[in-house]
């Protein structure tokens, strides 16, 4: 399916798919008896990547997650409607120490492949903005689709269960599975780690993937919060909390032009979240408060027509009045337009269109949408997501040092990386 024109709205027939739950195919352990289980593939994590992999990884697949329900991050994403991919997804929309790593997986399972899957399951969707595709009805439709595919593949899903004590053996891996108060020793030929990163710990994020990697000597790139609001310890923006405007926010020579929101603790909004993934601690960010126009020329033109007009009122036509009022003392915005020479106006506009700020930090993993860093891609096959030095060990999704922009890119990485691993595993069992 070719890309649609940017900015168009796309609609599909509304979905009537009901949410289903994958069956538990393993009988519960009996008290007092040592139990064991053998599977072809064990997937740790029942999020987007884990479920997608389980649905396509061949027979005898076990999925383990400590959550009460599968796909919890899917459920809450996109305001409950799941921004499941982006029409314009490409390798340029991702951050990684190895920027070429994503190309293979994204090319072999594209955004249009996932759209086709969604269409096959009659899930209604539309483009919201900038190529972002959302469910018309509910994110639960995506979860139901993945669970239906898992059921069809015969995958077993164990929720409120934990995996620990991972070991490598000649024939694969073993780990301890704690489920329903009983411990089972699981043997598996393939082990897939799909537990995500550290973002939003209240949803159950633990960083388990990095612990597993360390246990098998797979290197990990240091992690930090991404797609996250900035904080300022001086509370300077508390008086204008709630003020929003279109702006261009820049960090480390990378700029995003979307909405900016002032908060009690600092800055948020899509433009800020995007820039946060490129920001380095201690470095400045730049705010352009009037990116869509030549502010200097417009103020000069206004001065020529109505020089007695108050400068702050004139600025209020281009920047929210509450923000102008907030800046009045800092920038000495007294007087009428006629009182401001070309030089002073030019200096003022340069300031407003390149406002340099030094964040104290970010809101951290508590509110971060993603985790930057993760499993070092140099240790993985870009074609299969398999660890190069640990046969049959796979890392997929957010656990890997691949972070997408805001707007459906991280879900697409989940689908693409999951399919890369699933296909590699499936080929071994055909």
Report each predicted region and the residues it spans.
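A conserved short coil-to-beta-strand element within the FAD-binding core of flavoproteins
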Residues: 159-172
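An anion/pyrophosphate-binding glycine-rich loop and adjacent beta-alpha core
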Residues: 68-70, 75-76, 84-91, 124, ...
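Glycine-rich active-site loop/strand segments that organize a redox cofactor
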Residues: 79-129
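N-terminal Rossmann-like FAD-binding beta1-loop-alpha1 element of flavoenzymes
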Residues: 41-63, 425
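Core beta-strand elements of the Rossmann-like FAD/NAD(P) dinucleotide-binding domain
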Residues: 39, 181-190, 256-257
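Glycine-rich loop(s) and the adjacent beta-strand/alpha-helix scaffold that form part
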Residues: 190-236
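A glycine-rich dinucleotide-binding beta-alpha-beta segment and adjacent secondary-structure elements
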Residues: 159, 326-403
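A conserved FAD-binding loop/helix module that cradles the flavin
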Residues: 199-212, 216, 402-429
